[in-house]
Regions:
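Ferredoxin-reductase
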Residues: 40-122
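Generic alpha-helical secondary structure signal
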Residues: 22, 87, 128-132
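An N-terminal, well-structured beta->alpha segment
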Residues: 1-73, 99, 151
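Short, surface-exposed, polar/charged, turn-prone segments marking secondary-structure boundaries
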Residues: 32-35, 77-80, 106-107, 128-133, ...
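Alpha-helical scaffold segments in soluble metabolic enzymes
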Residues: 10, 26, 30, 88-91, ...
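Pocket-edge positions in alpha/beta enzyme catalytic cores
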Residues: 16-19, 81, 123-126
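Gly/Ser/Thr-enriched, mixed-charge loops and adjacent short helices
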Residues: 1, 114-152
Length: 154
């Protein structure tokens, strides 16, 4: 199975080669474990995630995969249907007092890439020790996450 490793501010890979729905679900599962284990150590933070994606191919599809896994794992997700930039997710994570933010984006990488960027509760990049915790929870098998979502348009 493909070994997922985070680099600067997240994990990046070529869409449909290594950046697949199955691999995104694996990272979402690891993120959910990190959120559940660590958010309880901060009394003012919710065990919740703000999620957004850029305009690259598959952003909404990959976001849906993240939401399915997070819902299955009991982590609340705040998601804007449509494009949400990294600064928007950072601000939302901070202002809504969520433990983490996730952005489906490859930032400056070529269009064939996508990525999974983690933001911490303060809105900035996730610290290396926390990234290591997330990586330690990435399973070496696929995650079965049925669609248990209810989307509300407001």
């Amino acid at each position: 199975m493909y070994k997922i490793r985070f680099g600067t501010d997240g994990w990046r890979a070529i869409i449909a080669q290594d950046f697949t729905v199955d691999n995104v679900k694996r990272v979402a599962y690891a993120t959910a474990q990190w959120v559940k284990n660590e958010a309880c150590k901060h009394e003012n933070l919710k065990p919740a995630v703000v999620l957004g994606h850029d305009c690259r191919f598959g952003g909404e599809m990959f976001s849906l995969a993240v939401m399915q896994v997070m819902a299955q794992e009991g982590v609340h997700v705040m998601y804007h249907k449509g494009i949400a930039t990294t600064p928007m997710v950072s601000l939302g994570t901070h202002d809504f007092k969520c433990f983490a933010g996730v952005v489906i984006t490859a930032s400056h990488n070529p269009p064939a890439y996508s990525g999974y960027k983690l933001k911490s509760f303060y809105g900035g990049p996730t610290k290396p020790d926390d990234v290591a915790l997330v990586e330690s929870h990435i399973p070496d098998h696929t995650i079965n996450a049925p669609n248990v979502l209810s989307l509300i348009h407001i």
